[in-house]
Amino acid sequence: MIGLIQRVKWAKVEVDNQTVGEISMGLLVLLGVEQGDDQAKADRLLEKVLNYRVFADEQGKMNLNVQQAGGSLLVVSQFTLAADTQKGLRPSFSRGATPALAQALYDYFHQQAALKIHTQTGRFAADMQVSLQNDGPVTFWLQV
């Protein structure tokens, strides 16, 4: 399971020109589900996302996690993160989970997140437009 996290000043996701999820300061989490992923991996990734220290403390050092900084999560499904780009000029998605598994784990991830922090989401498998102001920029690839 892959989480590409971006520290943002704000982020929103739209479907058919309608905003379906929006946060102010926090983390945009692009979530990719791979074959073999399960709820245990989702739990580990969520704990990493919630505890990853990417927000500045009083001394300007990245020492606070999203909860300590008072931020939120915007979780967006992103199957292209599971792409194999090693060969050729076209990505292969053979490592990606089936749509049913990916949706189940995406739903599980954001539901568990919502129990711990203010969480907004995109819409699984929809054609989405994601807008954000990356703060830093600060972007990390987390994989479990």
From Swiss-Prot:
Motif mapping: Gly-cisPro motif, important for rejection of L-amino acids: 136-137
Primary site of residence: cytoplasm
CDD domains: Dtyr_deacylase
Compartment list: Cytoplasm
Annotated Gene Ontology cellular component terms: cytoplasm
Entry-linked SUPFAM superfamilies: DTD-like
GO-annotated molecular function: D-tyrosyl-tRNA(Tyr) deacylase activity; Gly-tRNA(Ala) deacylase activity; Ser(Gly)-tRNA(Ala) hydrolase activity; tRNA binding
Keyword entries, A-Z: Cytoplasm, Hydrolase, RNA-binding, tRNA-binding
Gene Ontology annotations of biological process type: D-amino acid catabolic process
Coiled-coil ranges per UniProt: none
Substrates-to-products reaction catalysed: glycyl-tRNA(Ala) + H2O = tRNA(Ala) + glycine + H(+); a D-aminoacyl-tRNA + H2O = a tRNA + a D-alpha-amino acid + H(+)
Superkingdom of the organism of origin: Bacteria
E.C. code: 3.1.1.96
Function: An aminoacyl-tRNA editing enzyme that deacylates mischarged D-aminoacyl-tRNAs. Also deacylates mischarged glycyl-tRNA(Ala), protecting cells against glycine mischarging by AlaRS. Acts via tRNA-based rather than protein-based catalysis; rejects L-amino acids rather than detecting D-amino acids in the active site. By recycling D-aminoacyl-tRNA to D-amino acids and free tRNA molecules, this enzyme counteracts the toxicity associated with the formation of D-aminoacyl-tRNA entities in vivo and helps enforce protein L-homochirality.
Similarity comment: Belongs to the DTD family.
Domain remark text: A Gly-cisPro motif from one monomer fits into the active site of the other monomer to allow specific chiral rejection of L-amino acids.
Subunit structure: Homodimer.
Name listed for the protein in its UniProt record: D-aminoacyl-tRNA deacylase
Species of origin: Glaesserella parasuis serovar 5 (strain SH0165)
Designated gene of the protein: dtd
